[in-house]
Amino acid sequence: MRVADFSFALPDNLIARYPQAQRSACRLLSLDGQTGALAHQVFTDLLEELAPGDLLVFNNTRVIPARLFGRKVSGGKIEVLVERVLDDKRVLAHVRASKAPKPGSALLLGDDDSIAATMVARHDALFELRFDDARDVLTLLNDAGHMPLPPYIDRPDDVADRELYQTVYGERPGSVAAPTAGLHFDEPLLAALRAKGVEMAFVTLHVGAGTFQPVRVDQIEHHQMHSEYAEVPQEVVDAVLACKARGNRVVAVGTTAVRSLESAAAAGEQALTPFFGDTSIFIYTGYQFRVVDVLITNFHLPESTLIMLVSAFAGYRHTLAAYREAVAQAYRFFSYGDAMFITRNPAAAAERG
């Protein structure tokens, strides 16, 4: 299929720049993957959609304040977006500058240029930086970094984003973008779901900046997916297998949970096996899902790998029809926007656009 097949018109005013005042107050567009039927709901209607014994799988990563501004000692402004923390002193980062720093270049980062760093080496598009600071990397970023809001939010980050651009259950720092489907869950909703008997499990996938990179090929099969670190521990495997055995559904909260679970399924000969490592799994039309039965997700960018994943799950025609309806009904799009509840379309893998 062509990347252009996943384009759709989106008025600028439907891009959410700020979240709802209450996390769980967003709208929810439910899509029956098998029939294409749509229902307009609110997010707390999950209580009716989910049955006792269903398993919600969350991504418990936390967003780090990964953006730093500064300058090269030799002159010239610089912007650093940390992609991956290597150890207490080193990171891999995207660097924006009029002229890329060379190995050995000294940098002064932070709003007051107080953080000394050195460009150690270049690894393809990423720069290895070493911080010459008494603090470890995560403490340093927490003290001086900016929240890495997506480009389409198109405003500077503010103090409130440090809380709002995090899930309430995130506990593993390492992402440069939020697993946004999880932003809609607040403590009262989680408590109500537990009281109903809905099971919960947590994977980890540290979202990289590659999630915002455009697909630069014409045919989606030619796209090279970025790599991200994921963990699916044994207790998640056990919870998934128990859920399947009792005839309930595995409900992935977000595309990152999908990619984690399906990576674990692809890694072993069994249906699912523990997984700890990098994944570059690219899910698009034709993919045979092995684990996930239901997907909760936000509305994604045109021509993005994320809308391709949704299309592989619900079916291309059903997905594009749902997006057209969402635009017509003025749903809010992208990270701070509204959500979808999608049941898997077993016929989706046979579609070809």
UniProtKB/Swiss-Prot annotation:
Where would one find the signal peptide in this protein? none
- Its annotated pathway? tRNA modification; tRNA-queuosine biosynthesis
EC top class, as a word: transferase
Name one process (GO BP) from the record.
tRNA wobble guanine modification
Query: What EC identifiers does the entry list?
Result: 2.4.99.17
Q: Is the Nucleotidyltransferase keyword given for this protein?
A: no
Q: Which reaction does it catalyse?
A: 7-aminomethyl-7-carbaguanosine(34) in tRNA + S-adenosyl-L-methionine = epoxyqueuosine(34) in tRNA + adenine + L-methionine + 2 H(+)
Q: Which GO terms describe its molecular function?
A: S-adenosylmethionine:tRNA ribosyltransferase-isomerase activity
Q: Where in the cell is it found?
A: Cytoplasm
This protein's source sits in the domain of life called Bacteria
Going by the UniProt record, its keywords in alphabetical order are:
Cytoplasm, Queuosine biosynthesis, S-adenosyl-L-methionine, Transferase
* Gene Ontology cellular component terms for the protein in this record: cytoplasm
User: What InterPro entries does the record tag this protein with?
Assistant: QueA, QueA_dom1, QueA_dom2, QueA_sf
Similarity comment: Belongs to the QueA family.
The record describes its quaternary structure and partners as: Monomer.
Please describe what this protein does. Answer: Transfers and isomerizes the ribose moiety from AdoMet to the 7-aminomethyl group of 7-deazaguanine (preQ1-tRNA) to give epoxyqueuosine (oQ-tRNA).
Protein name as annotated: S-adenosylmethionine:tRNA ribosyltransferase-isomerase
Q: What is the lineage of its organism?
A: Bacteria, Pseudomonadati, Pseudomonadota, Gammaproteobacteria, Enterobacterales
Q: Report which gene this protein is encoded by.
A: queA
